[in-house]
Amino acid sequence: GSTGTPKAVVVSHRCVIDFISCFVETFNITSEENIANQAPFDFDVSIKDIFSGVFTGATVHLVPKMFFSFPTKLLDFLEERNITTLIWAVSALCIISSLDGFSYKVPSSLKKIMFSGEVMPVKHIHNWQKFITNAKYVTHYGPTEITCNCTYHIINEVIPEDGIIPMGIPFKNERVFLLDENNKLITEPGINGEVCVSGTCVAPGYYNNWDKTNSVFTQNPLEIRRFERIYRTGDLAKYG
């Protein structure tokens, strides 16, 4: 996990392979792309950088950590390396917009800007869209326990200043659904429920912690005729 005490999530090779194969297909990542790696290698977001390159032949550029304290150096790096693709934490994108980085330089080669890890403030996505108009903007949602992400939303609409960016739709190798406090499926809009995930993305569990594993990696209560393992995220969501 990214905050607090490390959760020590065990993620299998199969989970990574299945997720990345869907990821590169969904976003049409090719060998022509230059990806700027922002996430440390002990953070799950880095899986998308590393293995997108391995799967497709795209070039992965390692951004020096210190550059994220100096937006001018960071923007120079993106321009000099002809970076086409960012798969960054929200906070990294906000550094540039909050410090008015685009008044110094607007990278000309960016085509795909993807982000995850926390809610993107609308004012920051508006700032990026104002200066980089031809890029595809995509938000990702999902915890480490389901191998990085389980949903995505391509931002084609104008998000109101007081609005929020939707979680989006599931990747094709995953099923995402909402359960109420009685483990009943929620299908109506506007009703809060716990986000639950099934599919080949679900991790085996937590290293050497069976009690915690068994509390959130459970049998799907909607399936009574066959075994289906799900991850209960603890996050609440509702259909719009």
Feature locations, PLM:
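A generic "structured core" feature
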Residues: 1-12, 16-19, 29, 35, ...
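Nucleotide-sugar-dependent glycosyltransferase donor-binding/catalytic pocket residues
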Residues: 5, 43, 67, 121, ...
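Conserved AMP-binding/adenylation subdomain of ANL enzymes
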Residues: 7-36, 40, 44-84, 157
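GHKL-family ATP-binding catalytic core of two-component histidine kinases
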Residues: 10-12, 44, 89, 121, ...
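Alpha-helix/helix-capping structural signal
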Residues: 14, 91, 118, 200-201
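AMP-dependent adenylate-forming
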Residues: 16, 130-139, 154-240
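Gly/Ser/Thr-rich phosphate-binding loop
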Residues: 55-58, 83-87, 93, 97-166, ...
